[in-house]
Amino acid sequence: MKKVATLGEILMRLATPNKERILQAKNFDADYGGGEYNVAVSLSQFGVPTKFITALPDNAVGDAALYRIRGFGIDTTSILRQGDRLGLYFLEHGAAMRASKVVYDRAKSSISDIKTNTVDWQKAFSDIDWFHFTGITPALSKSAAEVTLEATKAAKEMGITVSADMNYRKNLWSPQDAQATMKPLMEYVDIAIGNEEDAEKCLGVSAENQDVTSGELNPDAYRDVLNKLSDNFGFKKIGITLRESISASDNNWSAIYSDNGNIYVGNKYSIHMVDRVGGG
């Protein structure tokens, strides 16, 4: 079975209990999360061999995160122990019409301070068939962006399949900064994943007559987006998620997919969510 490596940040997740607001909370439930870490965990639970590449502080907090990663059967042999701190995020679960709220405390985290030429990519990728990254890691810092590019180039040179979830985060960077960084990375990507906002903010590609902030989804409009992405960046496969928010706990979800120019529209599913964060 193919082995997948992901590169990114693991954060300690501090969630309010019983859907309390952050301002009400007297204590928080601690766990761990992160876009690329979540992918590694999910794949591992499906029986896919995985490796997670990150940087953790060399202290008890970093040890706790490392043990958590290992607990899911994920290969941790390429994790660096460096830097001063593990990033945090505070989570306020949504209720009814009140959306979930996330507050980040991740500045100067270990992964943000990672430098090029510190990971031996030939060794890290020696048993890897697929490399996955997201737009979150290069948004953390200039050096994290440089390491992401370094990893992506190495994977491509080694004949490894490369996938990218664009995952635009407005709290981390502007569309202008995102495009300046993400467009060069796309040269090495075989498979792209995202939604309509990701395509517009990260790559400057938008659906005709579609407002990405309206919440109204028109699958036909995204055929043009898929064609533009294929033409401009040469992706072999592209997946765009289509999500309609009904409430904090109920969404309609579908997807549109391009496989070498052949476009497929998925069925729409009504989903009652147990935990929205990390659900894509």
Question: Which functions belong to the PLM regions below?
Answer:
Residues 1-21:
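Positively charged, low-complexity intrinsically disordered leader regions
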Residues 13-16, 38-45:
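Beta-barrel outer-membrane channel/assembly domains of diderm bacteria
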Residues 21-40:
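Short catalytic helix/loop segments, enriched in acidic residues and glycine
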Residues 29-32, 247, 269-280:
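Short glycine/threonine-rich catalytic loop with a Thr-x-Gly-x-Asp
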Residues 49-136:
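Conserved N-terminal subdomain of the carbohydrate kinase-like
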Residues 52, 162-164, 192:
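Hydrophobic faces of well-ordered beta-strands that scaffold small-molecule active sites
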Residues 154-161, 233-236:
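A short helix->loop->beta-strand "cap" motif at the edges of active sites that frequently abuts
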Residues 172-261:
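Conserved phosphate/ATP/ADP-binding segment of small-molecule kinases
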